C-alpha cells in the first residue's frame, strides 16, 4: 500500500507518541523481524539476487534496511528500503536516503523495479511512504530537545537514529 498527501500526514501525526520515541507501545520486535526477513526473501526472489541488509539497528526509530544491488535492477543503481518501527511504514530511496528529490527519483527509477518493490512490500503489509515529505521540519509532539540533530525532521522521527 502506498500513501501520500493528507493521508500521509494524518498517519504520521497519529503514530507520533512522545512517550515512545524509538518504537510504539506494545512493539513486537520478533514479529517485526519476521516481517522484515520475509521482505528480504521476497526481494531476493523478485530480483534474483542476494540483497544486503542492515539488521543491527539500535537507538533508532527504524527497524532495518535492505538494499537491492544495482546489478540486479533495471534502474542500474542500488534501491534501498528502510523499514520503520512505527505503523509498518517503509520508504524507498535511490542509492541512499536523501540523495535524490522526488522528481529525480521518478525520472531515474525503472518502472519494472517499482512494480517488484511495490508487490513485495504489499505482500508484507508494509505502507510505502514517499521519502521527500519526510525531510520536512518535524512539528509533532516530541520535544525538539530529544533529537540529536539541531533541525529535527519527520525522517528522523520515523526512519533514523534518535
Residue spans for each PLM region:
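Non-membrane alpha-helical secondary structure
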Residues: 3-7, 31, 35, 58, ...
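Acidic, proline/glycine-rich low-complexity IDRs
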Residues: 102-162
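Short, extreme N-terminal segment that most often corresponds to the first beta-strand
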Residues: 1-34, 154-162
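Generic detector of well-ordered alpha-helical segments enriched in charged/polar residues
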Residues: 9-13, 37-40, 114-122
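Type-3 copper protein
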Residues: 92-96, 100
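Short glycine-rich, low-complexity/disordered patches
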Residues: 20-37, 44-62, 119-139
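Alpha-helical protein-protein interaction elements
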Residues: 1, 75-78, 92, 127, ...
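Amphipathic, interaction-prone secondary-structure segments
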Residues: 36-90
Amino acid at each position: 500500500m502506498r500513501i501520500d498527501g493528507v493521508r500521509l500526514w494524518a498517519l504520521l501525526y497519529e503514530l507520533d507518541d512522545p512517550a515512545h520515541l524509538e518504537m510504539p507501545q506494545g512493539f513486537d520486535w520478533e514479529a517485526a523481524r519476521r516481517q522484515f526477513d520475509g521482505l528480504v526473501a521476497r526481494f531476493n526472489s523478485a530480483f534474483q539476487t542476494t540483497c544486503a541488509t542492515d539488521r543491527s539497528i539500535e537507538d533508532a526509530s527504524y527497524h532495518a534496511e535492505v538494499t537491492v544491488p544495482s546489478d540486479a535492477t533495471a534502474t542500474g543503481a542500488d534501491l534501498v528500503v528502510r523499514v520503520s518501527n512505527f505503523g509498518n511504514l517503509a520508504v524507498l530511496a535511490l542509492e541512499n536516503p536523501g540523495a535524490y528529490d522526488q522528481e529525480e527519483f521518478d525520472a531515474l527509477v525503472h518502472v519494472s523495479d517499482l512494480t517488484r518493490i511495490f508487490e513485495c512490500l504489499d505482500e508484507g503489509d508494509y505502507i510505502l511512504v514517499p521519502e521527500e515529505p519526510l525531510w520536512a521540519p518535524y512539528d509533532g509532539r516530541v520535544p525538539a530537545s530529544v533529537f540529536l540533530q539541531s533541525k529535527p525532521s519527520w525522517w528522523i522521527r520515523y526512519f533514523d537514529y534518535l
